[in-house]
Amino acid sequence: MVSVNLPWELVEEILYRVPPQSLARFRTVCKQWNSLFDDNKFVNDHLVRSRPQFMFRTDSKMYSVAVNFSGPWIEVHELTLDIPGLNCEMPIWLYNYVDCDGLLFCTSYKFKGVLIWNPWLKQTRLFASNHHYPTKYVIGYDNKKRYKVLDYEFEPSSKLTIYEIGLYSKKVKDLESDSSWSVVQSNSVSLNGTLYWAGVDVNNGIFIRSFSFSTERLTTFCRLPLKYNEDNILALAVFRKDRFSLLKLCNKTSKIKIWLTKNSINNREIGLVEDVVWIKLMTVLIPDFPKLPFRWYNRPDLTYFLDNDDAKRLVICCYDETQQVYIYIVRRNIVKKIKIDLFEDLLDQSSPHLRTYIPSLVRPTQVKEDNNKLYVL
């Protein structure tokens, strides 16, 4: 049989669509394939094309849930955190965790520092510190790709504190938040290192607020295409790594509306932005959709994504009133409901433990350090 060499551009296009856990096994095929893991362009392009998954933890374990639309059906994987030389348990390190560009940043109530973890590449990096990281925090990075932690409360006149990961004991700066900002109404998302939230100002307007780690400024990014209603639940998501989508759930009617920004989002340092155009993508009514409790801060009860290849396919993961986890796949007027069967009870829902996660080839070793108080595991 005569071997056929495909054009390298076609090989890359195929590999873009292969999940990270499978790509990791292909590193031994040839040097050229192995070099892709060090190619920033390939890593970034793969992240754009990677299909989001759901992640959640129980009292003792952590799981990822991949959705396959051909059935549809789901794959549930238990994620293990095995760190040689460090006596740790999964519940301790997953006391709180956030994600940024496919990396999980985990904090422990027993260890002072932060663990950076890519569960698909099975790579971790542990940064020691002389302080515990806050319980409410989000992760982003500045224009030099230095990862930083934002400690936030987002109440009038509350302080915003920045910590730089890789510095052993440096608290960068305390910042006063804008007192006109009333309450955070959605989860936070990170886009190109900048953080975004949906929320309400004192005049009941609905906006997206942003925080830039490059300028250390908290600003109003744009107005949202809806009115404030305390019965609504909002969720913000990144679509194809360059646009925002917004989900609004009316808890009374179970009607769900989805908007999508028309154009790519740039990290613009401006005040109120009126030129962000939102397109109403769909309105759906899911029968017997659970009634979700109201929460002021990052809602752990509902998370979602839009299919990268078909923006009008909506996938939602949420709890019902009995804390059972379900996935809803919505395309036009067809709704598929899939139960996630687990043998242990979920954590108290006050814990932020249900998330959308994008598998990536980003390695923890790409996080820079400025001191020798570092463990590479």
Curated annotation (Swiss-Prot):
SMART domains assigned to the protein according to its UniProt record, in alphabetical order: FBOX (SM00256)
PROSITE patterns: FBOX
Record SUPFAM superfamilies: F-box domain
Gene3D superfamilies tied to this protein: 1.20.1280.50
Pfam families hit by this protein: F-box, FBA_1
Residues spanning the membrane: none
F-box domain span: 1-46
Annotated InterPro entries: A_thaliana_F-box (IPR050233), F-box-assoc_dom_typ1 (IPR006527), F-box-assoc_interact_dom (IPR017451), F-box-like_dom_sf (IPR036047), F-box_dom (IPR001810)
Official protein name in the record: Putative F-box only protein 10
Source organism phylogeny: Eukaryota, Viridiplantae, Streptophyta, Embryophyta, Tracheophyta
Encoding gene, per UniProt annotation: FBX10
